[in-house]
């Protein structure tokens, strides 16, 4: 930004990181942590699900079905999510998706003996997780102003990649701990709930800020 004062030029350099870590710090942390947890769950589930299911007795046909249903659900979920984001509050839509995925993971831990219900839940979780993750980056572009949008989204992308790498590595820990299938799905519910909580807190904060601005306008 260039300003002129009494014939003198004063140049103020735009500092995107300064804005991110001051005015947009809380929202940034919530978005980054949410994306980190989201990709951690997604890559842990997709990378290790066939191996985990094979160790508990699923046959090859069932493994092929599960491996197909999860990404197919993700494609459908992403399309549906985009439709809802255009019509409703985007933060509200994604928050609801993570909370629904959290509940389905809990339900999944009790229904893995029922192949039909288990398959439906796998499809739905794939849709909710992949759809929410796909919608997170458009949400971030709405959150940041143009002056720091590129930096904010890039930081979010980098941090989420760390979650993806960690998720791919955590499968070996699961085998080391020798967790049963119910415990594995319950453990996946924990980071999913954290992702939901991050967006819920961001949404709550934005509502409070909007209410305060409305009160100021009414007072004026």
Tell me the role of every PLM-derived stretch:
Residues 175-191:
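A membrane-interface helix-boundary motif in multi-pass transporters
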Residues 78-89:
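Helix-to-loop junctions at the C-terminal end of transmembrane segments
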Residues 20-79:
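Extracytoplasmic gate region of multi-pass secondary transporters
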